[in-house]
Structure formats: C-alpha cells, structure tokens
From Swiss-Prot:
InterPro entries: DNA-dir_RNA_pol_insert, DNA-dir_RNA_pol_RpoA/D/Rpb3, DNA-dir_RpoA, RBP11-like, RNAP_asu_C, RNApol_insert_sf. Coiled coil: none annotated. This is DNA-directed RNA polymerase subunit alpha. Keywords: DNA-directed RNA polymerase, Nucleotidyltransferase, Transcription, Transferase. Residues 1-235 are annotated as: Alpha N-terminal domain (alpha-NTD). DNA-dependent RNA polymerase catalyzes the transcription of DNA into RNA using the four ribonucleoside triphosphates as substrates. Residues 249-333 are annotated as: Alpha C-terminal domain (alpha-CTD). NCBIfam families: PRK05182.1-2, PRK05182.2-5, rpoA. Its EC number is 2.7.7.6. One of its GO terms (biological process) is DNA-templated transcription.
Length: 333
C-alpha cells in the first residue's frame, strides 16, 4: 500500500514484556527514522526527573540530637539509618501532601519498613526493607515525615526555608520523589513492507513498586503531550482558558474566611497576613501560620478543626490560584 510522502508512520505494534512486578520492557514500532531517539530520549528524561511520588524527608529519633550520633543497642549509626530510610517506598492514596508516621521497635530484632505504623491511606510497598538491627538492649523509636513531591530535593534547600521553625533533633533527608529507579532506551531497525529504514523503540524501565511501569510510561507521555500542546495553537484564546480553570475550582475555596466563623482573634490574624479567602488559607502550612503575630497553637487548632469539618486541611496545593476574578477583586479593593 502506497503512502503519501508527507504522512508519518505511527506505532501500531506495542508489546509489554513484564520481567517482574516492578520491571518491564516496552517495545513500540514502527517510527519514522530518527523518531525513536527523539521520543525515547524525551520520555527517559521525563521519567527520571519529573514523575511525582512520595519520600521520607524528615526523621525525629528518640534520644538523637544530630546525625553523627550512635544509639545504644543499635548496630547501625544514625547516618546509616537515615540512608536506609531514604529507600523506604511509600505510597499515599489520598489527597494529602504530607503525613507523619511512627515507628517503635524493641530488640533483639530486625527493624524493617513493615514496622512503620501507617494510616489507612498510606502504604509501605517494600515492607521487608531493612532499616536497622537491634540487640537485646536495643530500642528504636522515631517519627517520619513523608511528603509528596517531584524530582530530587536536597535536604539543605529545605532546611534553609525552615531553619527558624525546625526543632533540634529533626534530621533532614535528601529526597528522591521519583518512583522510577532506572530507565534506559535503545533503538533498533524496524521494517514495514519494503521499508527497512524505520525505528523500533525499546524502553527498559524499573520502578520502586509505588507505580506500575506501564502507568509510568503513560504518565510521562501525558506530561510530554501537555507540554507540547502549547505549540499546537500559539494563538489560543487565553480568556477561554481562564474560564475553564475557574470552573474547576471548588466554590468553597472562593468564599471569604469570614464564612468559617472563626474567633475574632483568629480572623484578624489571618487578615493581617492578607488571607482573605479559604483558598488562600488552605495553601498555608502550620509553620507559616505559627509565624503570624498573635496567632498561637490554640488559634491554629481552631483553624484546623474548622477546615477539617469541611473536608479541607492546611498545606494543600492549588493550581491556577488565585483565579482571575479574585485578582480583580483584590486589585479593586
């Protein structure tokens, strides 16, 4: 069958070879010559650097003030324990962006990721991963802060943002959020009828178990598609985009904080920080609010309880906020 010289071939043969639950090879063919490397390299970079995931970013170990300590009855020193915590694969099923988990174990025993007490919407994917070894007198108690993120985040960048509020003994970890542990691609020759100058793309992908390899490929392709969409219609109607964004925002977030019926003290503290709408409030963290003059723990707990009653919480992330309508209102005010 003869094809137009301007018509590009699209992959029609897709094979997935599962090596194990976390490791797969995905084969796509045929591509026009050169497109195997073009798309393979783009997907590989996205898979390694831009996939969202969860990681332990902070540990508070009972009796430990800094990472250069040793714990009586524990075979590993604190630095080794922190390195082991970095490899704990955590999956959060809910909408929360962070969670604090607890671990408590007495010796003699091996402390594994499965010993971490989790909430109903949190899953430890590698429960057999070893964290520490305890002898007869050993005991290990700690709290772990797990957050959702993307890419790689060094501990020193996070520490500089929270130095004033971070208590002594809260040990910071470099965080690798990407669930993709290893990815490579290769391009081989493919053939369609009489054409032998085509590409076959083979992607070899391994994850930490929190994300299926096939789903990782789909998400990376979606990210690439969304980024390229801007080039498809460079004259897109921006006003229409703004309207669509506002339609997706929960109406409760557009309501003023006065509707929360907080005490006068709490309400005045929020307004002093230019927090006028519920959408403004939920994006603030507890640490940020506690820095507000005259706003103490009691007011903070009141705010958290009122938000929880409406299915909201502090530290949430909102895209496209504030919407254009609120920007106009604030400008006119």
């Amino acid at each position: 069958m003869q094809r137009s010289v301007t018509e590009f071939l699209r992959p029609r043969d897709i094979k997935v070879e599962e090596i194990n639950a976390n490791h797969a090879k995905i084969v796509l063919e045929p591509f026009e010559r050169g497109f195997g490397h073009t798309l393979g390299n783009a997907l590989r970079r996205i898979l390694l650097s831009s996939m969202p995931g969860c990681a332990v970013v902070e540990a508070e170990i009972e009796g430990v003030l800094h990472e250069y300590s040793a714990i009586e009855g524990v075979q590993e020193d604190v630095i080794e324990i922190l390195l082991n915590l970095k490899d704990v694969a955590v999956k959060m099923h809910g909408n929360r962006d962070e969670v604090v988990l607890a671990l408590s174990k007495q010796g003699p025993s091996v402390v594994t990721a499965g010993d971490i007490a989790v909430d109903h919407d949190v899953e430890i994917v590698n429960p057999d991963h070893v964290i520490a070894h305890l002898n007869d007198s050993g005991e290990l108690k700690m709290q772990l802060k797990v957050v959702r993120g993307r890419g790689y985040e060094p501990a020193d960048t996070r520490a500089s943002e929270e130095d004033e509020s971070r208590a002594i003994g809260r040990l910071q970890l470099d965080a690798t959020f990407s669930p993709v542990r290893r990815v490579s691609y290769s391009v081989e020759a493919a053939r369609v009828e009489q054409r032998t100058d085509l590409d076959k793309l083979i992607i070899d992908l391994e994850t930490d178990g929190t994300l299926d390899p096939e789903e990782a490929i789909r998400r990376s392709a979606t990210i690439l598609q969304e980024q390229l969409a801007a080039f498809v219609d460079l004259e897109a109607d921006k006003e229409q985009e703004v309207e669509e964004e506002e339609d997706q925002i929960d109406p409760i977030l557009l309501r003023p904080v006065d509707d929360l019926e907080l005490t006068v003290r709490s309400a005045n503290c929020l307004k002093a920080e230019n927090i006028y709408y519920i959408g403004d409030l939920i994006q603030r963290t507890e640490v940020e609010l506690l820095k507000t003059p005259n706003l103490g723990k009691k007011s903070l707990n009141e705010i958290k309880d009122v938000l929880a009653a409406r299915g909201l919480s502090l530290g949430m992330r909102l895209e496209n906020w504030p919407p254009a309508s609120l920007k106009d209102d604030k400008a006119s005010a």
